[in-house]
Amino acid sequence: MRHASNKISVKKQAAAIGVCVAALLLGASGPYTTRLSPLDTRAIKTVAVISALGNTFLFERVPDKVFAWLGPPDSHFLEISDWKIDPSIEKTVSAALARRFAVKPIVFRPADFSTWDYSGLKRASLDLNGDPAIDAYVLILRDWRPDEIGYSVHELGGLGLYRKDRPGGHAKLGVFASYRIVVVDALTGDTIASRAALLPENKLPWLPEDPALWPKTPNDMTEAQRAALSAAETKLIDATLLPTLAAMRLAR
């Protein structure tokens, strides 16, 4: 009886392992994977590119206070559509994708994709009413990442300039680009793949900056400051955009 019981137990364990393996295989091609499966790349023929990253710029300051982590940082936004970051991203991504897919234009409102979660992204994607021939949307969106500049408990999202004050009036500054690329099924609105755009070793894209770059207020920025920040963001995006597309099997 004990031998029979052991056989049943082994069979149950084998069945459980089989279920787990099947679930893993199914999950590997489902939502929230970090790259397209071979089946996805064969099924997707036509895409549209949506970049909703470069309309606003965040100024985030963490003061030199003992309990600064208890409350939100001092944050201000600046409208930067005149920097033309999104059109540049869309042009670069479209050119890279055109080697593998047909790329079609799409009309969208950036505000619909500025603050998002996956359920909201599904609704916004289904509301696009794009060309029925489009199989998937490739979206470049603001992401929220842990603070790897000043190591506070706050998160950094989108494009911005971060400042953490230190004792003695010193400050640590960094320009960051926190974003991700998401592929959405145009018919169902479901997420096919999603991947954060990171530097090697999964690091937040950021560059150290001189404290003199911090303006009194966002609206007081000089042309030199605007040019420096725009150039820094372009450098970060150039370093991460195409490698992320390649890692997702969107581009060769």
Feature names for model-found ranges:
Residues M1, N55, P146-D147, V153-H154:
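Short regulatory "switch" loops immediately downstream of catalytic or recognition motifs
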Residues H3-G18:
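Bacterial N-terminal signal peptides that target proteins for export
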Residues A16-G27:
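Bacterial N-terminal signal peptides
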Residues S29-F57, P167-R252:
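C-terminal/domain-edge helix-coil "capping" segments
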Residues Y32-T34, F77-E79, Y118-L126, G157-G168:
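N-terminal post-signal-peptidase region of extra-cytosolic proteins
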Residues L58-G150, F176-L198:
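N-terminal segment of the mature soluble domain
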Residues R61-S81, G158-P167, D210-E223:
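A solvent-exposed, charged loop/short amphipathic helix patch at secondary-structure junctions
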Residues S152-E155, P208:
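Outer-membrane beta-barrel translocator domains and adjoining extracellular loop/strand segments
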